[in-house]
């Protein structure tokens, strides 16, 4: 992927997408696929995982990826915000059903998969536990990801239960 500087992105009249650099993070990969599906060109700005990303924070108010920045609009970081922006700006087939009941289902599943405390959040938390077990206390304290996501070793059982419960519910929904 070709990345541009923050300065170049600030000068654009189109969409800028801040995405993980060097690691195929699931949220960034999903955001890129979403905007590509809707045929929306974007400039990519790199976000360096597990670092403070102070330049991004100063520009957007966020240090994580993905971040969608469209001129004269606030930065968007949540999955449903990205989906709504892509639907509004893009071309091609909509990912949203025309009927309200279907849209409610889609937005609910998006939130349950990619939203705060959703399946992806829980899975990341479980990965953090393995990662944390290989780090010193000082290294963990220096890594902004652990504090940003409220990592707490005692929450592992609850996160595992939430992830398993989601997968059970998803299996039931697919069978229905």
Regions inferred by a protein language model and the residue ranges of each:
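A mid-sequence, solvent-exposed acidic-amphipathic segment
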Residues: 148-176
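GST-like domain detector, emphasizing the conserved glutathione-binding G-site
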Residues: 1-146
């Amino acid at each position: 992927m070709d990345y541009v500087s923050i300065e170049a992105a600030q000068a654009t009249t189109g969409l800028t997408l801040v995405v993980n650099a060097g690691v195929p993070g699931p949220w960034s990969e999903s955001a890129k696929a979403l905007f590509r599906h809707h045929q929306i060109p974007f400039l990519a700005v790199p976000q360096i995982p597990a670092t403070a990303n102070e330049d991004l924070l100063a520009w957007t108010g966020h240090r994580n990826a993905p971040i969608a920045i469209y001129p004269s609009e606030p930065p968007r970081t949540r999955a449903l915000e990205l989906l709504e922006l892509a639907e509004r700006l893009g071309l091609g087939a909509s990912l949203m059903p025309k009927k309200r009941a279907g849209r409610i289902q889609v937005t609910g599943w998006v939130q349950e998969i990619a939203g705060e405390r959703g399946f992806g959040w829980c899975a990341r938390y479980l990965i953090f536990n393995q990662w944390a077990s290989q780090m010193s206390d000082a290294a963990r304290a220096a890594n902004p990801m652990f504090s940003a996501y409220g990592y707490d070793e005692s929450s592992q059982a609850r996160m595992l239960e939430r992830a398993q419960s989601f997968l059970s519910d998803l299996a039931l929904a697919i069978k229905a």
